[in-house]
C-alpha cells in the first residue's frame, strides 16, 4: 500500500487504512485443498462388496478404473478383458452391450473410464521389446473397442521400467495413464516403479500409491512411519514429490472401507487432512513437510464397490474436501 503523506488527509484516511490493514488477514487465509482427482476401481467381479453397474458410479469419481484386464495366455505381454459372468448374473443379466453403453454414459457426465491391468493376482510380464509391443497393441485394441480413455498399471509382482515405459509410449488413444504401486515400490527413485513413473512423466496422469497392506515405511525425513496414520501418507508422498514427480502426479490410495484391505484403513477425513497438509501446510499431523506443493494430484480408493457398501463415505468425504 502507498501511504498519503499530506497531514490534512491522515485523519480522513484512518478508517480506510484500518480496513485495509485488516483485510489481508482474511484474504491470505490458507485454502482447503480438495482432491484434484478422485480415482476409484470398479470391480469386474464379485467378492462381498456391492455389485454395481458401471453407470451406478457417482460423478464424484473423476476417473473410474475397470478392474481388471488379465494376461493373454497365448501372447506374451498381451492382455485381454471380458465382463465377468458372475458379476453379470449378480446384476440380473448385465451384458457386454450394457457395459459399453455405460462407458458412454460416464463420458457424457465428464468422467474418464480406464482399463486397469493386473491387480494382486495379475501375472502380466513385459520384459522385452516383443512383449512391450504386444502389450501396447492389445491395450490399444481394448481402448478402441470399448472406448476406454486410457490405462492403469497395477502390477504387484515386479515390473520392468524400461520395457513397460516403451509399451506405454506405444499405446494409441490413451489420454489417461495411471500407476498404482505399493508403498515399497516408491521408497526410492532406484526402484522399478519409481523409475517407470519418471520414464513416462511426459504422459503420466497420476501415481496412486497404495498406502495400505504395507506395514511401516520410511518417510522423506528418514523416520519410520506406520500405516493407518496421516503422517504415513504425507511423509511417504513427500518422497515422491522430492523425487521428481509433479505435484499433480502424486495421489494417495486408500481402502474405501475397513473391508477393502487387510490393513491400512483410516478415516477418509485423514486423507483430506493429508492433502491439505501437502498442498497448504495446514492440518498436518506430527510430520510437517519441508515445503508445500499446490495442485497435489488427489486420491484413489479400493474400491468404488466397497465405498458403495459403506454409503460412499470415502467419496463424499474426500471429494467434498
Q: Model segments located where?
A:
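Residues that scaffold, gate, or flank divalent-cation-dependent active/transport sites
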Residues: 303
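N-terminal onset of structured domains
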Residues: 274-275, 283
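Secretory targeting and sorting signals
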Residues: 1-29
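Chitinase-like catalytic core of GlcNAc-active glycosidases
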Residues: 30-251, 256-273, 290-296, 306-320
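Short glycine-rich, acidic/polar surface loops and turns
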Residues: 283-289
Amino acid at each position: 500500500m502507498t501511504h498519503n503523506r499530506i497531514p490534512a488527509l491522515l485523519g480522513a484516511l484512518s478508517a480506510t487504512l484500518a480496513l485495509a490493514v485488516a483485510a489481508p488477514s482474511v484474504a491470505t487465509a490458507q485454502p482447503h485443498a480438495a482432491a484434484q482427482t478422485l480415482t476409484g476401481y470398479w470391480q469386474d467381479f464379485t467378492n462381498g462388496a456391492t455389485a454395481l453397474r458401471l453407470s451406478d458410479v457417482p460423478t464424484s469419481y473423476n476417473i473410474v478404473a475397470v478392474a481388471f484386464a488379465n494376461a493373454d495366455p497365448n501372447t506374451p505381454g498381451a492382455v485381454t478383458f471380458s465382463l465377468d459372468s458372475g458379476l453379470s448374473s449378480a446384476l440380473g443379466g448385465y451384458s457386454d452391450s450394457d457395459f459399453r453403453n455405460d462407458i458412454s454414459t460416464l463420458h457424457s457426465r465428464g468422467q474418464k473410464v480406464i482399463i486397469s491391468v493386473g491387480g494382486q493376482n495379475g501375472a502380466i510380464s513385459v520384459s522385452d521389446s516383443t512383449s512391450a509391443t504386444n502389450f501396447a497393441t492389445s491395450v490399444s485394441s481394448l481402448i478402441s473397442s470399448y472406448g476406454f480413455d486410457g490405462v492403469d498399471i497395477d502390477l504387484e509382482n515386479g515390473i520392468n521400467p524400461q520395457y513397460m515405459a516403451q509399451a506405454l509410449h506405444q499405446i494409441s488413444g490413451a489420454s489417461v495413464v495411471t500407476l498404482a504401486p505399493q508403498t515399497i515400490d516408491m521408497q526410492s527413485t532406484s526402484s522399478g516403479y519409481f523409475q517407470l513413473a519418471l520414464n513416462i512423466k511426459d504422459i503420466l496422469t497420476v501415481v496412486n500409491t497404495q498406502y495400505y497392506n504395507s506395514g511401516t515405511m520410511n518417510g522423506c525425513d528418514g523416520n519410520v512411519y506406520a500405516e493407518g496414520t496421516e503422517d504415513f501418507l504425507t511423509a511417504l508422498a513427500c518422497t515422491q514429490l522430492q523425487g521428481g514427480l509433479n505435484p499433480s502426479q502424486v495421489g494417495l490410495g486408500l481402502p474405501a472401507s475397513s473391508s477393502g484391505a487387510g490393513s491400512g484403513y483410516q478415516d477418509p477425513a485423514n486423507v483430506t487432512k493429508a492433502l491439505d497438509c501437502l498442498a497448504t501446510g495446514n492440518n498436518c499431523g506430527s510430520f510437517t513437510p519441508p515445503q508445500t506443493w499446490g495442485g497435489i494430484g488427489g486420491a484413489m480408493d479400493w474400491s468404488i464397490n466397497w465405498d458403495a457398501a459403506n454409503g460412499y463415505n470415502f467419496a463424499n468425504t474426500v471429494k467434498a474436501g
